[in-house]
Structures are given as C-alpha cells and as structure tokens.
C-alpha cells in the first residue's frame, strides 16, 4: 500500500470514548456523536476515529477508541453534553494512506497499511494512537473514503 510520511499538528478533539469490540463501538460512538453534533449545532472541522490498542494484543472487550470531531483550540464543551470528552491527538510524524472502505470492512485496509509499514527501512511504528479521518459521509454514499494515520519514528541505528 502506498503511503507518505508527514508532520501533523495536534488536533483538538471532542466526542465519545468507547470500550469494546470496535465493529460495535465505533458505529455506536458515531451514532452518539452525530446526535450530539446535530443537537448542539457543533461545526466539526473533521470526523475522526482514534484507536488506542493493538487488536492482536488486546481482547476485543477491552479495545479503546474515541469517536470524535476535531474542533478549534478555543472550543468549550456545551452544557448538557453528557459523556463528551475533550482531548487531543498528538502532533508528530505520521504515515498516511488513503483507502475506500466498502461493506463496513475497515480492517482490510488497516492490515494492508500495517503490513506495508512493517517493511519500511527508515521508519517504525511509534507507541501512540492511530486514527482515521473520514473524507465523506459513508452512510449516505454507501462507502467510506478514509485517510489512515499511523504515528512513526525513525528506526534506531
């Protein structure tokens, strides 16, 4: 899979922290997020899912993710926003790849991306969260165009 390495600025994010199998929690989290964004007239900059764990190492019921929107630095969580978190995605070097997801199969492009990164001679995966940015409304279009971001660092030696 083709990818590029680019410096990313930190992103301030607001939304919901979810724990459990991603195929359930990501969908549920975005349903909650859409209701919150619509109900509070939030103007999201981006729609993002942040992934904190390696599903090959962490049991499905303990997988953590955030379903969030990026917001301006001066954003304040409005009243009556039960369960909403405000945090950030760290700045740094990220490997970035794009993919089209059909039939809700988000796993295949991520696996392909990780397999490509593991063969990189110059960069290795850094121990920070990964995230994906949605470039369209998959519920309306029937597919999702996404950008996948994996934190990287120079290989030692």
Swiss-Prot record:
Task: Write the record's keywords in alphabetical order, separated by commas.
Answer: Cytoplasm, Stress response
One Pfam annotation reads GyrI-like
Q: Which GO terms describe its cellular component?
A: cytoplasm
Primary localization class, coarse: cytoplasm
**Location in or out of the cell:** Cytoplasm
Please name the GO terms that the record assigns under molecular function. Answer: DNA topoisomerase type II (double strand cut, ATP-hydrolyzing) inhibitor activity
Q: What does this protein do?
A: Inhibits the supercoiling activity of DNA gyrase. Acts by inhibiting DNA gyrase at an early step, prior to (or at the step of) binding of DNA by the gyrase. It protects cells against toxins that target DNA gyrase, by inhibiting activity of these toxins and reducing the formation of lethal double-strand breaks in the cell.
**UniProt record similarity statement:** Belongs to the DNA gyrase inhibitor family.
Q: What name does UniProt use for this protein?
A: DNA gyrase inhibitor
User: Origin organism of this chain?
Assistant: Enterobacter sp. (strain 638)
Q: What are the leading ranks of the lineage?
A: Bacteria, Pseudomonadati, Pseudomonadota, Gammaproteobacteria, Enterobacterales
Q: Which gene encodes it?
A: sbmC
């Amino acid at each position: 899979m083709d990818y590029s390495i680019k410096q990313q600025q930190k992103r301030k994010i607001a939304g919901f922290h979810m724990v459990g199998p991603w195929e359930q929690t990501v969908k549920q989290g975005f349903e909650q997020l859409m209701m919150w964004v619509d109900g509070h007239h939030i103007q999201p900059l981006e729609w993002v899912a942040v992934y904190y764990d390696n599903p090959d190492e962490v049991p499905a019921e303990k997988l953590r993710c955030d379903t969030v929107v990026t917001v301006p630095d001066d954003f304040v969580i409005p009243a009556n926003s039960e369960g909403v978190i405000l945090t950030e995605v760290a700045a740094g070097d990220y490997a970035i790849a794009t993919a089209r997801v059909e039939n809700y199969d988000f796993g295949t492009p991520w696996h392909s991306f990780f397999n490509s990164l593991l063969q990189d001679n110059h960069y290795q995966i850094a121990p920070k969260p990964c995230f994906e940015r949605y470039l369209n409304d998959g519920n309306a279009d029937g597919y999702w165009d996404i950008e996948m971001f994996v934190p990287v660092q120079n290989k030692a030696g």
